[in-house]
């Protein structure tokens, strides 16, 4: 019999991207993430090697309680693109407080030329969603209660 676990909200996510700087701009300028760490600690810091291993030439950003890491794609796979139909991530959804926040986000997307779908109400789940994609084509959405 499985032991029930009491899980909290997602702590962190790491995405593999084709261009860390392009994705950094997208996630900071459009979604409000702040840079938490974008370089290993100094060489004389006892945790230097750990941060080199953990960052993997990428960055870590924060928005509220969520940490989002970006790491570069393996250079041998430069033509690889996100595909929600392969085994792995289908999409990633970020919570917002209200449907009005989704509408404001849709307007900001329009102003910045970010392609997105219309806001859709999903009454069986009690939410509205605003689907869009990041620069690597990863399926994202903003979600708010109805």
Please annotate each region the language model reported.
Residues 43-48, 75-81, 118:
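A short, acidic/glycine-rich surface segment
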Residues 16-67:
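Core segments of cupin and vicinal oxygen chelate
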Residues 1, 8-11:
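N-terminal leader/capping segments at the start of a protein or of a new domain
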Residues 41, 73-74, 145:
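Residue-level structural signal for beta-strand termini and adjacent loop
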Residues 63, 67-70, 143-146:
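Short, basic, helix/turn surface patches
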Residues 2-3, 10-18, 59-62, 80-146:
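Vicinal oxygen chelate
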